[in-house]
Amino acid sequence: MKQILVVGDLIADYYLWGRSERLSPEAPVPVLEVQRESKNLGGAANVANNLISLKAKVFLCGVVGDDLEGEHFINALKARNIDTSCILTDKTRCTTLKTRIIAQNQQIVRVDKEIKDPLNADLRKKLLDFFTEKIQEIDGVILSDYNKGVLDFELTQKMIALANKHHKLILCDPKGKDYSKYAHASLITPNRIELEHALHLKLDSHANLSKALQILKETYHIAMPLVTLSEQGIAFLEKGELVNCPTIAKEVYDVTGAGDTVIASLTLSLLESMSLKEACEFANAAAAVVVGKMGSALASLEEIALILNQTHPKILPLEKLLETLEHHQQKIVFTNGCFDILHKGHASYLQKAKALGDILIVGLNSDASVKRLKGDKRPIVSEKDRAFLLASLSCVDYVVVFEEDTPIKLIQALKPDILVKGADYLNKEIIGSEFAKETRLMEFEEGYSTSAIIERIKRTCND
């Protein structure tokens, strides 16, 4: 698990959701009838939250006010297992709060409560001391600058210098027009408008994009210069040449927090030794997930994998499957297995399982799970291909891949009407049976097994 230190401006995102179908008699403004409220972690905390969703360990450095919002904010961070030992309280400021009013899933106004003054010398010293203490034990750093007073020029440059001294990857999400503040960072993630304002250069051509990225590299000594281009993806330099990593087409509901998702996923993928191109593809996939949701949303590894693999529409992560089935009234049948080298016996078994109900869900062991259960030489067929083959069967309605050795979490979440296992489970404990209304044992078709097929192939090769 990678350990990442995030430093920056902490923002509490508050949402009022409802319907607006009339104007106020007091003024020509819409009236919102509130149906629900929600609170999200924003700013640098949203970056940290994205990293948690991507299975990283996160230390968060920032400042909240001495108020109720700050107290709630810290509790929300702890609930997400984000280290809060360097969240400082500033008695001279309020916790930054952005309130968004949403009517019929459209944002109609945002109200900001904030103080942008720079931190006092004592708070800056405490942040730098914590950074200095942590820099040796973490893998990478993200500076998330929302221009709310935490990351001034001097503190930013000291942190970049310390990260470079200890050979740590450091990425910055910049604000403002003076990019010398981020000089010598490993990578910065400006969007098109931010970079145009900083360099006073219109990015309306490949030539100007390339020129802008060269300036970041040569003038500001950014090791991996790139620019995010909204629906056009991400552009970066590779051996001096401009490369565009296109975005993944997806319906956009809300771009709130997409930049936080991009820098979090870029950081983690680079720390996992991906190339810059691979990291940009990963970040684009993560962004495609979050813009398809309302609010400062998160992308899970399973959702990103689904986008990257462009898999069959029947192959869903558990969260998405539960959403799909939320209002169903049909009888659900669940079974699971490795299904390595799909054969007639598998197909016959699944057809009989489907006949027991309306919706057949197949839990599929991941490659890592199969390897633990059956040895290093298995699976023969990758989980991506196994899932696709299963989804291609007309009797299978959904396929969900699980990483664990058993499907207990899937069964507990899905609570199927019927749990189907092979007849070889007779007089054996059936994991998850307590969460199903009924358990059925089903005979396999004789003469068919993956192991037998593998042995037959071996004998043929030896002959």
Curated annotation (Swiss-Prot):
Signal sequence range: none
Renumbered residue ranges of the record's region Cytidylyltransferase: 334-463
EC number: 2.7.1.167, 2.7.7.70
MF-aspect GO terms: ATP binding; heptose 7-phosphate kinase activity; heptose-1-phosphate adenylyltransferase activity; phosphotransferase activity, alcohol group as acceptor
Domain of life: Bacteria
Pathway recorded for this protein: Nucleotide-sugar biosynthesis; ADP-L-glycero-beta-D-manno-heptose biosynthesis; ADP-L-glycero-beta-D-manno-heptose from D-glycero-beta-D-manno-heptose 7-phosphate: step 1/4; Nucleotide-sugar biosynthesis; ADP-L-glycero-beta-D-manno-heptose biosynthesis; ADP-L-glycero-beta-D-manno-heptose from D-glycero-beta-D-manno-heptose 7-phosphate: step 3/4
Active site location: 260
Catalysed reaction, written as an equation: D-glycero-beta-D-manno-heptose 7-phosphate + ATP = D-glycero-beta-D-manno-heptose 1,7-bisphosphate + ADP + H(+); D-glycero-beta-D-manno-heptose 1-phosphate + ATP + H(+) = ADP-D-glycero-beta-D-manno-heptose + diphosphate
Alphabetical list of InterPro entries matching this protein: Bifunc_HldE, Cyt_trans-like, PfkB_dom, RfaE_dom_I, RfaE_dom_II, Ribokinase-like, Rossmann-like_a/b/a_fold
Transmembrane parts of this sequence: none
UniProt binding sites for ATP: 191-194
Keyword Aminoacyl-tRNA synthetase on entry: no
GO biological process, one term: ADP-L-glycero-beta-D-manno-heptose biosynthetic process
HAMAP family: HldE
Self-association state and partner proteins as the record states: Homodimer.
Family statement drawn from the similarity comment of this UniProt entry: In the N-terminal section; belongs to the carbohydrate kinase PfkB family.
PANTHER family: BIFUNCTIONAL PROTEIN HLDE
The name this protein goes by in its record: Bifunctional protein HldE
